[in-house]
From Swiss-Prot:
It comes from the Bacteria. This is 4-hydroxy-tetrahydrodipicolinate reductase. Its main location: cytoplasm. One of its GO terms (molecular function) is 4-hydroxy-tetrahydrodipicolinate reductase. It is an enzyme of class 1 (oxidoreductase).
Length: 239
């Protein structure tokens, strides 16, 4: 039986994972950590977990990694809003532990990323813009998924990523990301390839959080026998 530690257990993603975990026979939630705990509680939390699924806040990541290293606890990180210093921590931890990071753990969003990469190879001279829409209470903007998609395309086209174009003209060497916030939207991501004569748009819409939670649990199960490295969901789906 795989013992999973759930960090961010009282958040929306944590609650959804708790609702879905019973569908998986070979794992259980063995430990929980949330905003009511002290950071030092991460010690026993990691000790009692084989793999941790983290949907908390960037502020606890360094402590979480330190205790995970102490107890050799594998990490699945889904927390968004991470900054460059956080990714450096993940890369360093992955030299010792298997670590999986993804801004979006649904198969649909990862297929969207794969399709965007393939379309980019063909539509090399098209402009690319990304529009992401989320509920009114989402804190980070642009979304981690939008950044993931933009980075995937930019790596193939050698483009810069622009979050706020302001009043300046669009350059030929950039991908723009625009954000909408409102309602109770779980997540919509649209990638538009704009040519002079036609527009091709790829779109993914999450109808609820189930696909994210199922992806996170699958990631924890998949990671349990992997060697130390930094993985993504595309390693699981082999795309």
């Amino acid at each position: 039986m795989l013992n999973i530690g759930l960090s961010g257990s009282t958040g929306k993603m944590g609650e959804t994972i708790l609702e879905r975990i019973d569908k998986f026979k070979d794992c259980k939630i063995a430990a929980k950590f949330n905003s009511t705990n002290n950071l030092d509680d991460l010690d026993n939390f990691c000790k009692n977990s084989d793999v941790i699924i983290d949907f908390s806040t960037p502020e606890i990541l360094e402590k979480l990694i330190n205790y995970a290293l102490k107890h050799n606890t594998k990490l699945v990180i889904g927390t968004t809003g991470l900054q460059p210093q956080h990714f450096k921590l993940l890369e360093k931890a992955a030299q010792t532990l298997p670590v999986l990071y993804s801004a979006n753990m649904s198969i649909g969003a990862n297929l969207l990323s794969y399709l965007a990469k393939e379309v980019t190879k063909i539509l090399d001279d098209y402009d690319v813009e990304i529009l992401e829409t989320h509920h009114r209470n989402k804190k980070d903007s642009p979304s981690g998924t939008a950044v993931m998609l933009a980075e995937t395309i930019a790596s193939k086209k050698g483009l810069n990523i622009t979050f706020n174009r302001g009043n300046r003209l669009r350059s030929e060497k950039e991908i723009g990301i625009s954000s909408l916030r409102g309602g109770n939207v779980h997540g919509i991501h649209e990638i538009s390839f704009l040519g002079d004569d036609e527009i091709i748009t790829l779109k993914h819409e999450a109808l609820n959080k189930n696909s994210f939670s199922i992806g996170a649990i699958k990631a924890a199960i998949w990671l349990q026998d992997k060697p130390s490295a930094l993985y993504s969901m595309q390693d699981i789906y082999k795309i």
